[in-house]
């Protein structure tokens, strides 16, 4: 690939692997900004449950693509793709080094690999009908019309199941038949972050979330946007809702959130290895290894 193309650095890794802290150190060293590639941190007022970079961290290093929309207005992959590519191109025009950080593989690859994403807006009436059917029935429907998608979507992932059905019913085409468009003209270095003690890190982060106030944050979101806000069905918020409804205890919520997050992290790592194949960083000295790899790439 031509060295005349704009350079773009990417840091990917599963949830709770420490991407935020490492990314800030890397951004400080290379005097650049961070483009946040996360499917939930794009929403305002969802700070604790998404482990969003703190206000102090955001003051230290400028973050793009955080708090860009209210949770009541979902941003699909197609919309995020356009917003993110515009932001990155703006950085390139200013001769800055775009630095993309995140754990949402689909969102990341839609930006860097040029995935075609159908521009299908939310179909509220259809969604209500599908939600009334329940996840098992929706899963069976998806298996009939788009069996390949059921191999990529977790059985318990209600949001992605409904989205796949939504795309099929609106376009008549399975979501799994999406094709890759021409990728952006960027020279990309992908770095991967993983941890040997990831399960312990996930447990600790989950405990921190509940002690920091995810239940109160969930209650605030419910009071502002309603109990049926779709994003509150995602990991952490769903369990906090159950506590608020007296259907669960905090200890059980922590246990279930931890289990679901570990399962999610496993799927993330599988995605990264199959779809991205990054240069994995040495856990013994992450920052030093990242700097060496980036400087070698840029030289």
From Swiss-Prot:
EC number: 2.5.1.75
Coiled coil (residue ranges): none
Chain residues that bind substrate: 15-20
One of the record's GO molecular function terms: ATP binding
Binding site for ATP: 13-20
Cofactor(s) the record lists: Mg(2+)
Region (Interaction with substrate tRNA): 38-41
First-tier enzyme category under EC: transferase
Keyword terms: ATP-binding, Magnesium, Nucleotide-binding, Transferase, tRNA processing
SUPFAM superfamilies given in the database record: P-loop containing nucleoside triphosphate hydrolases
Record site feature (Interaction with substrate tRNA), residues: 104
Catalyzed reaction equations: adenosine(37) in tRNA + dimethylallyl diphosphate = N(6)-dimethylallyladenosine(37) in tRNA + diphosphate
NCBIfam families: miaA (TIGR00174)
Description of how the protein assembles with itself and partners: Monomer.
Family per similarity comment: Belongs to the IPP transferase family.
Name of protein: tRNA dimethylallyltransferase
Gene behind the chain: miaA
